[in-house]
A protein has these predicted regions:
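A short beta-loop-alpha structural element at the N-terminal edge
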Residues: 6-22
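Ligand-binding pocket scaffold of soluble enzyme catalytic domains
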Residues: 31, 41, 64-68, 87, ...
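Active-site rim helix/loop that mediates acceptor-substrate recognition in acyltransferases
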Residues: 31-54
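Conserved beta-strand in the GNAT
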Residues: 54, 60-71, 83-88
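Conserved acetyl-CoA-binding loop-helix of GNAT-fold acetyltransferases
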Residues: 89, 95-108, 132-136
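Conserved active-site alpha-helix within GNAT-family acetyltransferase domains
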Residues: 100, 123-161
């Protein structure tokens, strides 16, 4: 399905080849990307759990985002609030309005399910552009702290990630 289309950007449903493309491109920019994440999202799409969107920029997949209408994790798990998660625009395509249009589309989809939406936000500096965009769009932290593997992190504990 196509959700948005102007002369340069198309927002559409994700397909398997997008996962291969993004895995390759993210590795080229130094990210630890695997196809597993995209396969999981597409499985969730097939099971009716999420909507996975891709932004094509002049016909090339340049970014993606996922909307879970009733997310099963995080501070608002299973409360009927949609979550926007795993948002990315490849570095070489940033500053072209792709991220804003992706988020506009994701928010519009989320609004069909509830008046409140929440975000899954990465905390390392690689997500800095997205973090700044979320603030500009008016998102406010919920105050529950940092979550890892579906649990709130305990103050002063050491957390090891991949």
């Amino acid at each position: 399905m196509v959700y948005f289309n102007n002369e340069e950007i198309i927002i559409r449903d994700m397909i398997f080849s997008d996962g291969l493309h993004f895995t390759d491109e993210e590795r080229k920019q130094g990210w630890d990307s695997t196809i597993d994440k995209f396969e999981m999202r597409l499985k969730d799409v097939k099971n009716g759990k999420c909507i996975s969107l891709v932004a094509d920029y002049y016909g090339i997949p340049a970014g993606y985002v996922n909307v879970y209408p009733d997310s099963e994790w995080g501070a608002f798990a299973n409360q009927g609030y949609p979550e926007i998660i795993d948002f990315a625009v490849l570095e070489k395509y940033r500053k072209n309005g792709i991220g804003s249009i992706l988020m506009d589309t994701a928010e519009k989809i989320a609004s069909e399910y509830a008046d409140t939406v929440y975000l899954g936000v990465g905390l390392h500096n690689g997500y800095g552009s997205a973090q700044r965009m979320y603030v500009k769009r008016g998102y406010i932290p919920d105050g529950s702290g940092v979550w890892y593997k579906d649990k709130i992190c305990t103050p002063y504990d050491t957390i090891y990630t991949n």
